[in-house]
Amino acid sequence: LLSEVLKRWQGSDDDAAAASASFDDADVTAEEEEASVDTPPQYSGRALAENSQFVTFLRHCRRPHDPPPNLVVYADPIGLLREFGRDNTGIKIAMATFPALGVDGLHAVGFTSTVAVDRFDGLNHMHLLLGNPRAGVMQVIAAEPGDTTPPPFVFDDLESYLTWNWNFRSSFNTIRALVDRFQFEGRTDRFVKESISERLGLDFEKDVIDNLGGRVVWMIGYEQPARFRGQQNTLALSVVDEDAAARTLATFVAKYADKFEERRFGDVTYQRFKIEWPEQFQEDPPTDPFLAVMDGYFLFGGSCQLFERAIAARDGTIPRLADDPAYQHLAIEVEQEVPGVTPVFWSYSRSEETLRQWYDLLTSPKTRDFLAEHSEGNPFFTALVESMEAGELPPFEVLAQYAAPSVGIIYDTDSGYHGIGFSLRANVEPTSP
């Protein structure tokens, strides 16, 4: 490996070959020379830039008019496994199953990052290089292009909004075919019936899989007032038949009636989990989970408070993310960067809300009292308490200007899945659509 690196560093093939030969021949015994005849070469001698997979990756992950990325990460996972498992029988046996599983369709994965380029504060690209046609486990990834507009129940002051479109029936069928192939025919159906359907009191395939519409919405936000366990998640799955989804939920709740408490907010009825938390969690419980069916979605999450904010956003009593100018600005930039592309995945993050959470925690009386009680013998806590007492923390508005929102998408290409993510420089005006 060192020989190959030096060869390219020097830039002269003739000189590099001589240097390589002298490097290789130094201190080689007769026994080592004889053994080397039967040892296959580890390196092809080609530069990485001549690798067709790397060339394909870089073509997708670097815009032609941009300078070279500040960071490039590239890996061939199967190749790495093959090299590291050269003398490992277990790895060799596992790799022998890769063609049947379709794992050998994963050719490479790479990532590039460029800082302060063009209109962007940071611009990142990712590419998952897949073979064609995709087979086996690669077909489990059943992401599909579709609508990524935030539904009306997505409120604007969340930390992250993620959404994607997925063919659940296709994924389920692929998993069933793979499991049955390596175990026995009907293994998956037996497991689903005995371990899921009978336990939940429903037909999992008919009532759940076949009623999923394919749209997934994931919201991450913070409860108010700020607390250490305030970050909570809400997941929403679109359904084909809302009435059928409501009946499925009612069947499940009836089976475990003692575990739920019915609640109502506005015109929405939902189920709150009844959990007896240990004493140490009663004042600050980790979660307050719920289940609900609303507006063509099945929703579940870790905070009733955040769900009620979602209802309020749907009803128009608090701002919605889709109407937020910062979100609209980044959505326009995405359209300009990849015109005509319909993503399979979309993410939007507001680091301002993360910063607000920790700022509110640090400045709350409860946190100040905690730090004061535990500052003795702790230089960091002591310095923090002294800074807050001296009023050295700047106003939140000063800090917030350095927390720009960011956006990221993933879309399907002929060579695999490509992702792009960025945040904009300060004071960048929206591009004309």
Regions found by a protein language model. Give the residues of each.
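Long, K/E/R/D-enriched contiguous segments that form extended
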Residues: 158-272
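Hydrophobic or amphipathic alpha-helical targeting/insertion segments
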Residues: 1-19
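A common structural junction motif
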Residues: 13-16, 254-262, 318-319
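Leucine-rich, highly hydrophobic segment in Treponema pallidum outer-membrane-associated proteins
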Residues: 5-6, 19-178, 211, 215-218, ...
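Extracellular/lumenal glycan-associated surfaces
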Residues: 231-241, 297-306, 422-424
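Conserved RecA-like P-loop NTPase helicase motor core
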Residues: 1, 287-303
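Short, Gly/Ser/Thr-enriched beta-strand-loop segments that form substrate-interacting elements
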Residues: 269-286
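Short loop/beta submotifs within extracellular cysteine-rich repeat domains
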Residues: 2-4, 81, 243-244, 306-309
